[in-house]
A protein has these predicted regions:
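Catalytic Walker B motif of ABC-type/P-loop ATPase nucleotide-binding domains
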Residues: 172-175
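Conserved ABC ATPase "signature" region
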Residues: 114, 118, 125-143
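Helical segment within the ABC ATPase nucleotide-binding domain
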Residues: 187-200
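ABC ATPase "signature
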Residues: 232-233
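Conserved catalytic motifs of ABC-family nucleotide-binding domains
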Residues: 168
Length: 283
């Protein structure tokens, strides 16, 4: 718990509220403790990675942060606004790209983004402007009037990223944004995210199963397992613990794989596997 407490803070060194401050967060679903008292914070303009296996608690943490569910206890704030007490305000500060596909395949790309702009109560003329703006930023301007059902997988994901950006968020939350994409499509998504970061200075919270993505993109990482943060630091710091040739994959196997093996060696393998499957379905 001391290690996690070291991750938490309420304000940046300049005194401004942090993009994300999470303190002693707990979330459960029935008997499954999905998130078990984690604390962390994210600095302005930072790309922060929340990594871990299925059922680690990453998506449940993100769902609290994005106001989709309420925590059992603890506190999460976004730029100083509590996600429970100021949920509507928080929603206007963040852009969220979930794991599940959110685009309507029977609408055009433009219509999808326009609808998201409407959800934020933007005036009609501004909706049109914002929709065209983010579609162009995602390289979809030429296909904006085509049905999404004709898009490739990479194009669909870029469209959903455009939806997440239409409100010009200060915090972008990406939950497995490139899962299922081929390497070229993944690279295209990240190139456009990086360009936007450079232009706007937005903060990014990322979950991913691709360790090479996390190593390249994230400035800091928290590695979760069974609802707790097992290790945290910069990619370089995490790898240095295991030696000069270590990769982030090695860190993942060391910090997560060992923990799983230890629990199964103690005879709880069946319960551990069942818990992981249940937590994975619940997020």
């Amino acid at each position: 718990m001391a290690a996690e407490s070291a991750l938490a803070a309420a304000a940046s060194p300049g005194g401004d509220p942090l993009p994300v401050a999470c303190t002693e967060l707990r979330v459960s679903f029935g008997t499954v403790q999905a998130v078990d008292g984690i604390s962390f914070s994210i600095a302005p303009g930072e790309v922060f990675g929340l990594l871990g296996p299925n059922g680690a608690g990453k998506t449940s943490t993100i769902r609290v942060l994005t106001t989709l569910i309420r925590a059992d206890s603890g506190r999460v704030s976004v730029f100083g606004h509590d996600t429970r007490d100021d949920a509507m305000l928080v929603r206007h500060l963040i852009g969220y790209l979930p794991q599940q596909l959110s685009a309507d395949f029977q609408l055009s790309g433009y219509e999808n983004v326009w609808l998201f702009a409407r959800l934020f109560d933007l005036p009609r003329r501004e909706r049109q402007q914002r929709a065209r703006e983010v579609l162009a930023a995602m390289g979809l301007d030429d296909v904006r009037d085509r049905l999404v059902s004709t898009y490739s997988g990479g194009m669909v994901r870029r469209l959903e990223l455009a939806q997440a950006l239409v409100n010009r968020p200060a915090l972008l939350v990406l939950d497995e944004p490139t899962i299922g994409l081929d390497p070229l499509a993944r690279g295209d998504v990240w190139e456009r995210v990086q360009e936007l970061r450079e232009e706007t200075g937005m903060t990014v919270l990322l979950t991913t199963h691709y360790m090479e993505e996390a190593d390249t993109l994230c400035e800091r990482i928290a590695l979760m397992h069974h609802g707790r943060i097992r290790s945290h630091g910069t990619p370089a710091e995490l790898k240095a613990r295991l030696g000069p040739e270590a990769t982030l994959d090695d860190v993942f196997r060391h910090d997560v794989g060992t923990a799983i093996e230890d629990e199964e060696m103690r005879g709880g393998g069946r319960d551990v596997r069942r818990t992981r499957r249940t937590a994975g379905r619940l997020g």
